[in-house]
Amino acid sequence: MVSLMTSFVVETFVPGGSQDRFTADVDGIRLAAEAHVAVEGRVHHVRSYLVPGDEMGFHVIEADSIELVARVTETAGIEVERIVEAVSVEPGRVADDAMEGAS
């Protein structure tokens, strides 16, 4: 059985909310993730979001560890505000905790 990777959100500052700059950052993360897979373990860029009005970029990365995510962003030359673990809740699913609170 294959174990699931942990999801992380990488928060970055994108000066001026530049889509060109953000696209370059995303390309860098994808290339760095591919390079690290061959050497260090499992890491996968899932998706990225730019919030131009706030000059913020958010990258969802699945990996075996937060340290691996940090190495990927460093290799990509991305200046990171923070990296945090994230939990995905799929549409139509109700968490066990929510069900317990409803009774």
Q: Where are these predicted regions, by residue range?
A:
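Short S/T/G/P-rich N-terminal loop/turn motif that feeds into the first structured element of a domain
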Residues: M1-A38, R42-H44, V51, S88-S103
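An amphipathic, aromatic/His-enriched active-site/gating alpha helix that lines ligand/cofactor pockets
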Residues: V37, E62-V89
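Short, well-ordered beta-strand segments in beta-rich or mixed alpha/beta enzyme
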Residues: F8-T12, V46-L68, V72
